[in-house]
């Protein structure tokens, strides 16, 4: 049976046992004369692949573009609980939103961490027409065994807000890869530690390692007239580096979404 997608209003084929059971109840209610209508679906799906949890809800980036939304995305790696908690596990979220209406259009998540909780929360938000401005104010359950103080889903929404509002000039890994493949002349500024760099890194002659703590002392090594893309492990230090460079007069500095943890291409390792 085809359903109507809640975000596009168009028919969609997404067979799920959960949807079939909802249809069964709705049919029974209508047989009894209750006049109930099924509003539609988001195509939410989750699956466990060995030790990895995978989930999605709403539109993918390509589906959102095909539906003519003004698409903006973010990639946010994190742990599912605070970094100091012994049960922490990594996960990666991708959020898709519409730049004009600021409505959340989709979420995808992967990792050994608790992915499904985030999928369910944001699927609920999308069902109710939530915007990325609504999500950070959701009053979710918090304690260190279950979540970070600001949950990764809310953090991802905040990153999208910063993108749309021009607070932080992000660029996606795919856009950076396209720049590199076209042979563009830019500086890829890695602000992680030398140990992190040896463990895994992007192998490219445009990459320059300057740990964040040394950036101000070595800032004269950087070309002021060249585009600079900052990166770190997950994005925070890259953001700090961008603000340092912008404050020092650099004009064209971007932050790579999600850092090395969200880089979907080959990495070099010295392990």
Regions found by a protein language model. Give the residues of each.
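Short amphipathic alpha-helical face segments that pack within enzyme cores
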Residues: 19-26, 117, 121, 240
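Short, well-ordered alpha-helices that flank and scaffold nucleotide-derived cofactor binding pockets
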Residues: 29, 33, 124, 243-247
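Short beta->alpha junction loops/turns
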Residues: 53, 111-112, 128, 234-235
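A short, polar/charged loop-to-alpha-helix boundary motif
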Residues: 113-130
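Mid-to-C-terminal Rossmann-like scaffold of FAD/NAD(P)H-dependent oxidoreductases
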Residues: 2-111, 148, 152-153, 157-178, ...
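Rhodanese-like catalytic fold shared by cysteine-dependent sulfurtransferases
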Residues: 133-186, 194-229, 233-271
């Amino acid at each position: 049976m085809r359903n109507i997608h809640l975000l596009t209003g168009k028919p969609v084929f997404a067979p799920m046992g959960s949807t079939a059971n909802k249809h069964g109840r709705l049919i029974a209610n209508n047989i009894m004369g209750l006049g109930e209508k099924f509003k539609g679906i988001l195509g939410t799906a989750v699956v466990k692949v060995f030790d990895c949890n995978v989930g999605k809800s709403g539109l993918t980036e390509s589906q959102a573009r095909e539906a003519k939304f003004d698409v903006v995305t973010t990639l946010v790696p994190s742990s599912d609980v605070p970094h100091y908690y012994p049960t922490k596990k990594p996960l990666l979220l991708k959020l898709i939103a519409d730049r004009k209406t600021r409505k959340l259009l989709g979420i995808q998540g992967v990792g050994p961490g608790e992915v499904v909780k985030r999928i369910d929360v944001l699927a609920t938000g999308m069902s109710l027409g939530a915007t990325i401005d609504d999500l950070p104010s959701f009053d979710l359950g918090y304690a260190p065994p279950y979540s970070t103080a600001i949950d990764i889903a809310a953090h991802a929404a905040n990153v999208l807000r910063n993108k749309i509002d021009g607070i932080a000039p992000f660029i996606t890994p795919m856009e950076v890869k396209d720049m590199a493949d076209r042979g563009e002349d830019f500086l890829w500024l890695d602000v992680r530690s030398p140990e992190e760099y040896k463990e895994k890194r992007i192998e490219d002659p445009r990459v320059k390692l300057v740990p964040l703590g040394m950036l101000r002392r070595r800032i004269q090594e950087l070309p002021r007239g060249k585009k600079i893309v900052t990166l770190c492990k997950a994005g925070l230090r890259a953001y700090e580096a961008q603000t340092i460079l912008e404050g020092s007069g650099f004009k064209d500095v971007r932050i790579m979404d999600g850092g090395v943890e969200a880089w979907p291409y080959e990495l070099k390792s010295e392990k």
